[in-house]
Every structure is written in structure tokens, then in C-alpha cells.
A protein has these predicted regions:
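An N-terminal assembly and electron-transfer interface module characteristic of large anaerobic redox
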Residues: 1-279
Length: 279
């Protein structure tokens, strides 16, 4: 039995437990190889598709995918399918997609029941699944490590959190900012804390990732050491919530800020921000 896993799209939040658990089940965990796809999507979306095509080509039996909304369904509006149903979105784009195992993109003790069910289905051995869960369930306690973010002239980033787990994309943004003496700063609160920050804005947001993005805005706007703000918005794939964008139009942040897409010229953008910050 071989289960493929992604290395992006919030993988750092849920994958450590699932890799340990699958290995304890004596299931082979398959990681994606570098596989670029020539499709008309922004780089972060192409990377997701590239990893999925790579895992498919490696002949995995199942594909482990995250539910980034943690079981919450949107009752209004038409959110991007990339935000609300990654599995169904990939089924439309990847012919012959392996069967998917969808798990919450965050860890908590409540995930144990789902893990037990998946383990029994994969192994057809309830005793093995129970032993594997006993050995690994201590990893279900969600942990958060503050990112090390040295430097001055900090620029905070507000975006859908899936984007901020893409280290390759972040690397290109960091490099562009650094050319003009600026440094990237990611919100230094847990996802749950950011969702609470977002709720304080009373924007009537439903989806956890929308609340998290709104929380980034509130937290970074109030953080004195952050001198500028960068809002990443792609209306088709990774949009910021409409109420947050309306708030930005109505009440501009007190710091220099920009709202840009996923394929902006980071060097040019950094040059503009540096002038505003008088760097």
C-alpha cells in the first residue's frame, strides 16, 4: 500500500502526524519528486499540480489531501474551489487522479477517530491500526513554532495561509524585498489566534482561512515593528475575502501598503515600498 503526500498547501500543519501514523501502519509514504507542469496557472498552483502529477506517475494507491477549511462549509457566496474542495478541484484537472484521503489541515486530539477509520480501511487490520494510533497519537497535539524573522524594515504579508506555506514562492518574494533593504515578516501568532483576531473585525466571515487572513491584517496593522503591508490576492485561485478588501478601500491601513497578484514583480514592488518607507 502506497500513500502519496504533498509537501505544500499547509502540509507543515498536519503532515508530521500522518507520516508517522502511516509508517506505523506499515504503509509506504511517497513524497513528490520535482515535476513542473506547463499549465496556465500561477506558480503556487502549478506546484500543487506538479506534485499531484508526480505522485500519480509514481503509482500511489491513495493521495492524502488537506481540508484547509476544517470541515466548515461556505453558506453564502461562491468561494474559489481551490479554497473549499481541493480534492474535487484536482479531480477535474488531473485525469486518473488516485483515490483521495481528505484530512483536516490542523492537528487536534479529535482527529484520532478519523485516523483510526483510515488506518482500518488501509490495512483491514483493526489491531494494527489501534497499535499504530497508540504509538503516534501524542503527535496530534497541535504545536506552533514561532518563525525566526530577523531584520529591520519589516514588510508584513497578508494572504490565504496556503500561499504562505509555499517556501519556494516565499523565497522569491524575500529575494525581491531584500534587493531594496526590506525584510519579509509573517504573522507570529498561531492559526487559531489569527482566526480569533479576524473574528474581532466582525466582517461576517465563515471560512477559517478567510478569518486567518483577516487576522493577519489586524495583527500586522497594529504591530509597530512592521513598517509596511503587502496583501496578496488572486481572484480566481487564492482570493482575499471580499469584506476584507472592502475594509481596505474604506479604511486604508496607516502604513504603506500594496494589494497585488501572485505574479507581481517583487523587485519593482519592493522598490515602490522602499520609497514609501524612505529606505
Amino acid at each position: 500500500m502506497r500513500v502519496g503526500v504533498l509537501s505544500i498547501w499547509l502540509a507543515d500543519r498536519y503532515l508530521p502526524f500522518w507520516v508517522s501514523y502511516l509508517q506505523a501502519l506499515e504503509v509506504e509514504v511517497v513524497h513528490p519528486e520535482e515535476d513542473s507542469v506547463n499549465l496556465p496557472f500561477p506558480p503556487p498552483i502549478r506546484r500543487v499540480l506538479g506534485q499531484v502529477f508526480s505522485l500519480k506517475s509514481q503509482g500511489v494507491d491513495f493521495l492524502l489531501l488537506p481540508d484547509v477549511q476544517l470541515g466548515v462549509e461556505a453558506r453564502k457566496g461562491s468561494p474559489s474551489p481551490w479554497l473549499v474542495d481541493l480534492s474535487a478541484t484536482l479531480e477535474r484537472l488531473v485525469p486518473g487522479l488516485p483515490p483521495t484521503l481528505v484530512v483536516p489541515a490542523e492537528l487536534s486530539p479529535e482527529v484520532a477517530g478519523l485516523a483510526a477509520k483510515i488506518g482500518q480501511n488501509l490495512t483491514q487490520n483493526p489491531m494494527l491500526a489501534r497499535r499504530a494510533l497508540e504509538r503516534t497519537k501524542h503527535q496530534l497535539s497541535s504545536s506552533f513554532t514561532l518563525p525566526k524573522q530577523p531584520g529591520t524594515r519589516l514588510v508584513g504579508v497578508v494572504a490565504q495561509p496556503m500561499l504562505l506555506s509555499d517556501t519556494e514562492w516565499l523565497g522569491s518574494l524575500r529575494a525581491g524585498l531584500a534587493e531594496h533593504g526590506l525584510h519579509l515578516f509573517l504573522a507570529d501568532k498561531t492559526p487559531a489566534e489569527l482566526r480569533q483576531e479576524g473574528a474581532y473585525l466582525e466582517l461576517d466571515l465563515e471560512l477559517p482561512t478567510d478569518l486567518e487572513a483577516a487576522g493577519m491584517h489586524r495583527h500586522l496593522s497594529r504591530l509597530g515593528k512592521v513598517k509596511g503591508l503587502l496583501y496578496l490576492h488572486d481572484p480566481q485561485y487564492l482570493p482575499l475575502p471580499n469584506p476584507l478588501r472592502k475594509l481596505l478601500k474604506k479604511s486604508h491601513p496607516s502604513k504603506p501598503w500594496r494589494l497585488v497578484g501572485l505574479e507581481a514583480s517583487w523587485t519593482r514592488l519592493a522598490s515602490e515600498l522602499a520609497k514609501d518607507l524612505q529606505v
